[in-house]
Regions:
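Regulatory N- and C-terminal appendages and interdomain linkers associated
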Residues: 44-59, 72, 155, 183, ...
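ATP-binding glycine-rich loop module of kinase domains
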Residues: 54-56, 61-99
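The N-lobe alphaC helix and its flanking beta3-alphaC-beta4 segment of protein kinase-like domains
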Residues: 92-108, 112
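Conserved kinase catalytic-core helix
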Residues: 108-112, 140-176, 181, 207, ...
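C-lobe/activation-segment region of protein kinase-like
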Residues: 187, 191-246
């Protein structure tokens, strides 16, 4: 997944004695958004100083999400929280693995135009990711406030199918991990448990998990999963049979 030749001789994403290991980090915005040549990528020392912190948006068992700005742009900082019940070495190893997985797949999907947020900065050692802030609400909130319609749920299905067409299983497809932006476009977040493989069983598990959540947490939304599946199937009808992802 990680194109080391794109990042130069030492890649911070696969961490092969890279810039990150030397205490440096760099902006990923121009890399995965515009494909900036390596020679024009500016490396920053301690770029987390460019982060201006706001309020905490979410404090969960796995991570804390904080709003703020990054070089003046609306952003969020996601910081993985240590799990006290796990051995520190095991916890550190699992956190690093999941963060690296999330970073790799999110950047790879963003390059292909999939509905995921842009990642702007990472710090593996401190378990931090800075990414663009999506101005919107999680699907769970939209459904609870009865702010949904048929078109929205159909578009959720299309977003999920777009992920699967790129041979990525989400791994934790809950209504908390689907954001709806101001234009009513679904954005898929939190890919720490995702995997890249064109696996029909994995796709089915994603859909089954979402179905169970909709049925248990949102029983008042009648036919929700039917609409999601309608959108899921419709995307293939619009775009044709998916081609193998390179």
């Amino acid at each position: 997944i990680c194109d080391c030749s794109f990042f130069g001789p030492h890649c911070i994403i696969c961490e092969i004695n890279g810039a990150h290991g030397q205490g440096h980090r760099h902006s990923l915005t121009s890399i995965h958004r515009a494909g900036t040549p390596f020679s024009t990528i500016h490396f920053y020392e301690h770029t987390m100083q460019a982060w201006s912190e706001g309020k905490t948006l979410h404090l969960g068992a796995e991570a804390e999400v904080i709003s703020g700005t990054w070089f003046g742009r609306p952003a969020v900082l996601k910081k993985r929280r240590p799990r006290g019940w796990r051995h520190p070495d095991l916890d550190s190893s699992l956190t690093k693995k999941r963060m690296t997985n999330e970073i790799k797949l999110t950047i790879w999907l963003a390059r292909r135009g999939a509905p995921v947020p842009a990642i702007w900065d990472v710090d593996i050692q401190e378990a931090k990711i800075i990414m663009e802030r999506i101005d919107g609400k999680p699907l769970i909130e939209i459904l609870r406030n009865n702010e949904h319609d048929e078109e929205l749920l159909i578009n959720v299905g299309k977003a999920i199918r777009e992920l699967h067409r790129n041979a990525v299983n989400h791994g934790d497809l809950s209504t908390n991990n689907i954001l709806i932006d101001k234009e009513r476009k679904p954005i898929l977040i939190d890919l720490g448990l995702s995997s890249r493989e064109y696996d029909l069983e994995g796709f089915g598990i994603d859909l089954h998990v979402l179905h169970e959540i909709l049925r248990a947490s949102h029983p008042e939304v009648k036919g929700a999963m039917d609409l999601v599946l309608k959108g899921y199937v419709a995307l293939d009808e619009e775009l044709g049979k998916p081609q193998p992802a390179p």
